[in-house]
Amino acid sequence: RKGGVFSFFEIEGKAAHSGGNFEAGVSAIEELARKVQALHAITDLKRGITVNVGLVSGGQSVNTVAPYATGQIDLRYVERPDRDEAMGRIHEVIGRSFVPGTRAKLTIRG
């Protein structure tokens, strides 16, 4: 039977009008998209490790560079050392800014 860790991450960017002031914005949704790709790359099926970002949310309107975004992560593992390794990699991904000017926070839920 696999163990699991559920976590939640929040990303802050900077809002700007997407038509008139696009370059002043910092997209939290772009950051989220890049983090999702990096998080899913942690999956190692041969070792029984899976990382799934199953819920995402973000933005405030279609014509605004997204100032915030969130995601929820489900980590599954077989061996305890694999959990520790995967969690370390998850912390690295969340701690890294792929889009300059964004910040992210990870909260473990269980």
Where are the regions that the model predicts?
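Metal-dependent amide/peptide-bond hydrolase catalytic core
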Residues: V5-G110
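Acidic/histidine-rich catalytic neighborhood of metal-dependent amide-processing enzymes
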Residues: R1-K2
